[in-house]
C-alpha cells in the first residue's frame, strides 16, 4: 500500500494533528484503544481497504497511527497522552525536549531544535523502513511560534535531503494580525515561508483569522476557543485526505494531487475550504443539495485562508464530494461554476477543475464537500505577513533574540525578498492571458522587419 508518514510539531501542530487522528479514527471505525469495531460488512471493506495509508497494523490486530509527535517542551505531549486518544499512539512516537523554543524561530531551527532533530529523524526512518511503498510525508504545524515553524521547517529540509523523491505535504497555520499570540509572528512566518517555498510540494494555508470569521459569522459562536478552530481544521484535513484513505479514482495519492494542482513548482500554496460548516457538537437538520454544497464551497466565507478568491484567479482547483450523490449532478454543477465564473479561472490552463466523489460522508452529515484551490489571491496573505515583517525589520525590532542564537541579518533579508518574489510571481500569473505568448512573437517579428 501507499503509506504516508504523519508528523506534528509544536503546540499547534500537535493539537490539530491529534484532532485529525480522532476524526479519521472515527471514520475508519478505530477505537481509542486501536481496535477496529466496524458496523456492517460493506462498510468494513471500505474502511479497511486503504487503512494502511495512515495506520500500521500492530499485534493483536490493533491499528497504530503512523505518526511522529514532536515538541521542544513536554506540556502538549502530556495532554495528548492524557487525552481520550492518548493510548492510540505508540510510546516511541513521542519525541520531546525540555527547554521549549520560546516562540523563537532561531531556537527551533538552529539551536534547541537542531539538538532534537536527529532523534526525530530516527523515528521517521524507522516508520519509513516499515512501509511497503512510502508515498510521502505530511506535517501539521503553525508558522507563528518557535517549534512548529523553526523546527518544523528544519525537519522538512532534513527529510527532503534523505527522501528527495517523496512528496512533502504540510498543513500550515498562518498567523494573522487579529488573532496574534506573539509579537514576533511575522518574523517566524516569513522565515518559515522562505523554507516552505523551496522544500515542500504542497502546503495548505490555514489562517486563524479566517477560522475566527467562520466561527463568528457562520457558526454564530460568541467566543470561539482554539477547540472550535481546531474542529474546523480537522474537518478540512479529513476532507482533503479522503481520496488517499478511501478507494476512489481521482487524486488517489499525494503525487497525483500535486501533478493536478501545482502548475509551477514555487506556487504550491493552497486555500482549503469546506461545506457545510457546522459547529462542534451540533447536528445538521437539513441535508444540503449538491448545488448548495457547490455554491457554499466556492464561497469566500467558507475559505480557511483569509484571502478573497474574487481578488485573484484560480490556477487549479480540486473538489472532493462525500456522501451518496449523483455523479452526473456533481459534474453539471462543477461545469456550471466554471462557465458562469470563467473570469475567475485562468484560461491558459484548460480543464483546471478536478472533482472526486467518495461514498462515505463525515460523521453526522449526509453530504459534504471539501475544496482545494490554488488561487493567485493567496498573495494577499503573504503580502500581509510581509508588510508586518518589514515594519519591524526596518527598525531591527526584536532582532537580538534571533542574532543571539547565531542567526545573521542577511538571512532575514533573503527571506523577505523570497517572499516578495513569491507575491510578484502570483501577481504575474494572475494578469497573464492565453494570448500573451502570441503578442511577444508578433513584437519580435515587427522588430525583425525594421532591422
From Swiss-Prot:
Binding site for GTP: 11, 73, 142, 146-148, 208, 230
Region (Disordered): 430-451
Protein name: Tubulin beta-1 chain
InterPro entries listed in its UniProt record: Beta-tubulin_BS (IPR013838), Beta_tubulin (IPR002453), Tub_FtsZ_C (IPR008280), Tubulin (IPR000217), Tubulin/FtsZ-like_C (IPR037103), Tubulin/FtsZ_2-layer-sand-dom (IPR018316), Tubulin/FtsZ_GTPase_sf (IPR036525), Tubulin_C (IPR023123)
Superkingdom, taxonomy of origin: Eukaryota
Subunit structure: Dimer of alpha and beta chains. A typical microtubule is a hollow water-filled tube with an outer diameter of 25 nm and an inner diameter of 15 nM. Alpha-beta heterodimers associate head-to-tail to form protofilaments running lengthwise along the microtubule wall with the beta-tubulin subunit facing the microtubule plus end conferring a structural polarity. Microtubules usually have 13 protofilaments but different protofilament numbers can be found in some organisms and specialized cells.
Cofactor(s) listed: Mg(2+)
GO cellular component terms attached to this protein's record: cytoplasm; microtubule
Family of this protein: Belongs to the tubulin family.
Main subcellular location: cytoplasm
Subcellular location: Cytoplasm, Cytoskeleton
Function: Tubulin is the major constituent of microtubules, a cylinder consisting of laterally associated linear protofilaments composed of alpha- and beta-tubulin heterodimers. Microtubules grow by the addition of GTP-tubulin dimers to the microtubule end, where a stabilizing cap forms. Below the cap, tubulin dimers are in GDP-bound state, owing to GTPase activity of alpha-tubulin.
UniProt KW Nucleotide-binding keyword: yes
GO molecular function: GTP binding; GTPase activity; metal ion binding; structural constituent of cytoskeleton
Ranges annotated as biased composition (Acidic residues): 433-451
GO biological process: microtubule-based process
Pfam family, one: Tubulin
Keyword Acyltransferase: no
Residues that bind Mg(2+): 73
Keywords recorded for this protein, A-Z: Cytoplasm, Cytoskeleton, GTP-binding, Magnesium, Metal-binding, Microtubule, Nucleotide-binding
Amino acid at each position: 500500500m501507499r503509506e504516508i508518514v504523519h508528523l506534528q510539531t509544536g503546540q499547534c501542530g500537535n493539537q490539530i494533528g491529534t484532532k485529525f487522528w480522532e476524526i479519521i479514527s472515527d471514520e475508519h471505525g478505530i477505537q481509542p484503544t486501536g481496535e477496529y469495531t466496524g458496523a456492517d460488512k460493506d462498510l468494513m471493506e471500505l474502511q479497511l481497504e486503504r487503512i494502511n495509508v495512515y495506520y500500521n497494523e500492530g499485534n493483536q490486530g490493533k491499528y497504530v497511527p503512523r505518526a511522529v509527535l514532536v515538541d521542544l517542551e513536554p506540556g502538549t505531549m502530556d495532554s495528548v497522552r492524557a487525552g481520550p486518544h492518548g493510548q492510540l499512539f505508540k510510546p516511541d512516537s513521542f519525541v520531546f525536549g525540555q527547554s521549549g523554543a520560546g516562540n523563537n524561530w532561531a531556537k527551533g531551527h538552529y539551536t534547541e531544535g537542531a539538538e532534537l532533530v536527529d532523534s526525530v529523524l530516527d523515528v521517521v526512518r524507522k516508520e519509513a523502513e516499515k512501509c511497503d511503498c512510502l508515498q510521502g510525508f505530511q506535517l501539521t504545524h503553525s508558522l507563528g511560534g518557535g517549534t512548529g515553524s523553526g523546527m518544523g521547517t528544519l525537519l522538512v529540509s532534513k527529510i527532503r535531503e534523505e527522501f528527495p523523491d517523496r512528496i512533502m505535504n504540510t498543513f500550515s497555520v498562518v498567523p494573522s494580525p487579529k488573532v496574534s499570540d506573539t509579537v514576533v509572528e511575522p518574523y517566524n512566518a516569513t522565515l518559515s515561508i522562505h523554507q516552505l517555498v523551496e522544500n515542500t510540494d504542497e502546503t495548505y494555508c490555514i489562517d486563524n483569522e479566517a477560522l475566527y470569521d467562520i466561527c463568528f459569522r457562520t457558526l454564530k459562536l460568541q467566543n470561539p476557543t482554539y477547540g472550535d478552530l481546531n474542529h474546523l481544521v480537522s474537518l478540512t484535513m479529513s476532507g482533503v485526505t479522503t481520496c488517499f484513505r478511501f478507494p476512489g479514482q481521482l487524486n488517489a495519492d499525494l503525487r497525483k494531487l500535486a501533478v493536478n494542482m501545482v502548475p509551477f513548482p514555487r506556487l504550491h500554496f493552497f486555500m482549503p475550504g469546506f461545506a457545510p460548516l457546522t459547529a462542534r457538537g451540533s447536528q445538521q437538520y437539513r441535508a444540503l443539495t449538491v448545488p448548495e454544497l457547490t455554491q457554499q464551497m466556492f464561497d469566500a466565507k467558507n475559505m480557511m485562508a483569509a484571502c478573497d478568491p474574487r481578488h485573484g484567479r484560480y490556477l487549479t482547483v480540486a473538489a472532493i464530494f462525500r456522501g451518496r450523490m449523483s455523479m452526473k449532478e456533481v459534474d453539471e454543477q462543477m461545469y456550471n461554476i466554471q462557465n458562469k465564473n470563467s473570469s475567475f479561472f485562468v484560461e491558459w490552463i484548460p480543464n483546471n477543475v478536478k472533482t472526486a466523489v467518495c461514498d462515505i460522508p463525515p460523521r453526522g452529515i449526509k453530504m459534504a464537500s471539501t475544496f482545494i484551490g490554488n488561487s493567485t489571491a493567496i498573495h494577499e496573505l503573504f503580502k500581509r505577513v510581509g508588510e508586518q515583517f518589514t515594519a519591524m525589520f526596518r527598525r531591527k525590532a526584536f532582532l537580538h533574540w534571533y542574532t543571539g542564537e547565531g542567526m545573521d541579518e542577511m538571512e532575514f533579508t533573503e527571506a523577505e525578498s523570497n517572499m516578495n518574489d513569491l507575491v510578484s510571481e502570483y501577481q504575474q500569473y494572475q494578469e497573464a492571458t492565453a494570448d500573451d505568448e502570441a503578442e511577444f512573437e508578433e513584437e519580435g517579428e515587427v522588430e525583425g522587419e525594421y532591422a
